[in-house]
């Protein structure tokens, strides 16, 4: 924000809506995603008065929440505004995803007039009861802070608290604003530092954790580093790279941390994902006697159905606010601070690098298929690899797109986005939309399956509306392939669509979206060429492949996850 005080002065006299707008801008929000509804219309008017905020309309509340989630990936924080119950209930899905993925999204919901609280009135958009607190109570379960403004005098304190918690905890928060409250006067905002003051480490515990950890690491034969998904949200990527350079050991990354460490780095050892690992990463982790796990989270998905977990005895675990080493835990130690300080005390040890060079595959290049042969996944990956550059951000949706994305080698500064913890199919389309608004200079490319696309296709219309040149590769194999591999059944077959035609239908005579259907390598290459030239709107390339064409990694992963899901109850 150019001048926080200027933004405050622009809002005189201050109302609650104006106050919220100023605080959003001070927190770093430049765009807010909205679906209008009668309980939030007055608030939307107030937000529009702020010159530092731009309103972005969404097609529905699920997409609105996911668009804000994607914006938070690019911008560091996001906000979305919906109406009561019929809007917020739908948005809760995406907010749950933001919580799972450590993304600070501020969910703002209008709500009934305060005069109706405690009255005998039954209102629309409610459950048909006289208790209107249920949405606030629900929001508390999926946010790190939830506030409901019932008295204008409380608004500044409650708004500040919620936004500050979002920034500190990197989790979503909820702010409920009754329809008659947004225009009520309140105190003017104070300094931005009241909400943006960063958290700091406990210096005593930090030093103790670093000293003990350095002694242990320096006494080991083959230390390695493992990058986890929390590095990005908690701004620890640079500190992690600093430690990697100081220790000079092999570095593997979890699948949901791809691009958080440069793949061009000489010590990069690939993706650690059990039998779905790349470049021999599983071996280098399993052979290590000291694994520094930085910002890692192990779930059934990221551990390949619990089949790939680092040996606990060899793990030094660095979480976002604590370090666990040799059965000792040091709280109040921030991830970034610990990595930065540890880098000063470790000794270089390239034993794991020397060992890794002996097992690293010589080449990952995929041979070119006959241009006229039926299209397959390998040829799609080969051609997308040539499309990716340092300005690219690659989104991979839940499904076989994950495994295809892992095979893409990222040049330095390229980014990779995945939603592995929440795992909502269709997430990538609205999230990429929000990301493109937050990072307009990035080239956004999406891998999405046909079943996933059917969940959230409406947001393509907003890409058309805002002339966003997002390129989407829709892998059409006529079904939910990821679920087929976990547990097959007739419910995994879906109705085929003419996806290319649907995308162009969103133009309605005035947009610039393009849709292509391709069935071989030659057609795919031509579609990519035209997609690169289309700078005024989205391009969807429908890649038709055989229904049985899926990666062997997905088959293995699906088997392991299915086995974990099907484990019988413990005997009493």
From Swiss-Prot:
Binds 1 metal ion per subunit. It catalyses: a 2-oxocarboxylate + H(+) = an aldehyde + CO2. Keywords: Decarboxylase, Lyase, Magnesium, Metal-binding, Thiamine pyrophosphate. Pfam families: TPP_enzyme_C, TPP_enzyme_M, TPP_enzyme_N. One of its GO terms (biological process) is fermentation. It comes from the Eukaryota. Residues 400-482 are annotated as: Thiamine pyrophosphate binding. The keyword Lyase applies. The keyword Metal-binding applies. Its cofactor is a metal cation; thiamine diphosphate. InterPro entries: DHS-like_NAD/FAD-binding_dom (IPR029035), PDC/IPDC-like (IPR012110), THDP-binding (IPR029061), Thiamin_PyroP_enz_cen_dom (IPR012000), Thiamin_PyroP_enz_TPP-bd_dom (IPR012001), TPP-bd_CS (IPR000399), TPP_enzyme_TPP-bd (IPR011766), TPP_PDC_IPDC (IPR047214). GO terms for cellular component: cytosol; nucleus. One of its GO terms (molecular function) is thiamine pyrophosphate binding. Mg(2+) binds at residues 450, 477, 479. Substrate binds at residues 38, 125, 483. Signal peptide: none annotated. Its EC number is 4.1.1.1. PANTHER family: PYRUVATE DECARBOXYLASE (PTHR43452), PYRUVATE DECARBOXYLASE C186.09-RELATED (PTHR43452:SF1). Belongs to the TPP enzyme family. Homotetramer. This is Probable pyruvate decarboxylase C186.09. The lineage of its organism: Eukaryota, Fungi, Dikarya, Ascomycota, Taphrinomycotina.
């Amino acid at each position: 924000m150019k001048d926080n005080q200027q933004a405050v002065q622009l809002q005189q006299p201050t109302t609650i809506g104006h106050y919220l707008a100023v605080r959003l801008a001070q927190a770093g929000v430049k765009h807010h995603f909205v679906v209008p509804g009668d309980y939030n219309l007055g608030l939307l008017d107030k937000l529009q008065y702020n010159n530092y905020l731009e309103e972005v309309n969404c097609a529905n509340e699920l997409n609105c929440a996911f668009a804000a989630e994607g914006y938070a990936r690019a911008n560091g924080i996001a906000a979305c505004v919906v109406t009561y119950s019929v809007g917020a209930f739908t948005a809760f899905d995406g907010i749950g995803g933001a919580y799972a993925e450590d993304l600070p999204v501020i969910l703002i919901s209008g709500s009934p007039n305060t005069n109706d609280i405690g009255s005998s009135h039954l209102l629309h958009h409610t459950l048909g009861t006289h208790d209107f607190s249920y949405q606030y109570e629900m929001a508390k379960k999926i946010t790190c802070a939830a506030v409901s403004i019932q008295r204008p005098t409380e608004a500044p304190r409650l708004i500040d608290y919620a936004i500050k918690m979002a920034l500190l905890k990197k989790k979503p928060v909820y702010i409920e604003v009754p329809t008659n409250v947004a225009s009520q006067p309140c105190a003017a905002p104070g300094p931005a530092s009241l909400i943006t003051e960063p958290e700091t480490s406990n210096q005593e515990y930090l030093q103790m954790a670093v000293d003990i950890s350095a002694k242990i690491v320096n006494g080991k034969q083959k230390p390695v580093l493992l990058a986890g998904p929390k590095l990005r949200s908690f701004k620890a990527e640079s500190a992690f790279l600093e430690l990697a350079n100081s220790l000079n050991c092999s570095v593997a990354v979890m699948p949901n941390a791809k691009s958080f460490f440069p793949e061009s780095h000489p010590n990069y050892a690939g993706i650690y994902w059990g039998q779905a690992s790349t470049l021999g990463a599983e071996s280098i982790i399993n052979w290590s006697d000291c694994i520094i796990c930085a910002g890692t989270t192990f779930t059934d998905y990221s551990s390949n159905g619990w089949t790939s977990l680092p040996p606990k005895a060899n793990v030094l675990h660095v979480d976002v606010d604590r370090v666990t080493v040799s059965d000792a835990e040091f709280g109040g130690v921030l991830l970034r601070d610990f990595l930065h300080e540890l880098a000063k005390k470790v000794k270089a040890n390239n034993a794991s690098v020397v060992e890794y060079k002996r097992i690293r595959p010589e080449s990952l290049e995929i041979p070119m298929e006959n241009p006229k042969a039926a299209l397959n996944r390998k040829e799609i990956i080969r051609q997308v690899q040539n499309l990716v550059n340092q300005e690219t951000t690659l989104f991979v949706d839940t499904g076989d797109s994950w495994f295809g994305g892992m095979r893409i080698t990222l040049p330095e500064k390229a980014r990779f986005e995945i939603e592995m913890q929440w795992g909502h199919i269709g997430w990538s389309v609205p999230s990429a939309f929000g990301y493109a608004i937050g990072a307009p200079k990035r080239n956004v490319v999406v891998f999405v399956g046909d079943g996933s696309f059917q969940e959230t296709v409406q947001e393509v219309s907003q890409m058309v509306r805002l002339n966003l040149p997002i390129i989407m590769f829709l892998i059409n194999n006529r079904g939910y392939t990821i679920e087929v591999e976990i547990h097959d059944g007739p419910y995994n077959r879906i109705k085929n669509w003419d996806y290319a035609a649907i995308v162009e239908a969103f133009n309605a005579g005035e947009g610039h979206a393009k849709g292509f259907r391709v069935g071989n390598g030659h057609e795919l290459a031509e579609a990519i060429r035209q997609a690169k030239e289309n700078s005024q709107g989205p391009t969807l390339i429908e890649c038709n492949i055989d229904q049985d064409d899926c990666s062997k990694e997905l088959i293995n992963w699906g088997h392991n996850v299915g086995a974990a899901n099907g484990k019988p109850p413990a005997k009493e």
